[in-house]
Regions:
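Surface/interface-facing alpha-helical segments and adjacent flexible terminal/loop regions used
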Residues: 1-140
């Protein structure tokens, strides 16, 4: 079975062959690539949740009069999703600073667009530490 024709069936067949030790005919290069893709997917999900978290914390900080239950839920949900990802993938803890640094500009741009506030309102560099981002008690 070719992975391009029916990925699901290819994956199930490959997994079964691996379990039984039948390596003949397995596309080991493709299997390795798929495993790497799964790892990248987890890292991408973490980056996405961090961007959402930073965006809403910026709005929370710089538009206090507009704070809402919706914003609070977005912040709480992002933190919960991040905590779950880090619990399931502890090695991603070592990538947090890199991801925050890389994704903050997108969060900042989103805050500028969503709030309509001048760009100078929002710091160029992330104003939140990793500890603050992950702390369920931190709000401003």
């Amino acid at each position: 079975m070719n992975h391009d024709q029916d990925f699901y069936q290819w994956a199930m067949n490959s997994a079964q062959q691996l379990r039984t030790g039948n390596l003949a005919g397995l596309d080991l290069i493709r299997i390795a690539e798929e495993i790497e893709d799964m790892g990248r997917s987890e890292k991408h999900a973490l980056a996405s949740h961090l961007r959402v978290l930073m965006l809403h914390l910026l709005k929370w900080r710089y538009q206090p009069a507009l704070r809402s239950v919706s914003w609070r839920l977005s912040i709480t949900n992002a933190r919960d999703d991040i905590a779950e990802l880090l619990e399931d993938n502890p090695s991603l803890n070592s990538k947090l600073a890199e991801i925050v640094s890389r994704r903050y500009s997108a969060a900042r741009q989103g805050a500028i667009l969503e709030t309509g506030l001048p760009a100078v309102t929002f710091p160029i560099d992330c104003p939140f530490t990793i500890v603050q981002l992950l702390d369920s008690e931190y709000w401003s």
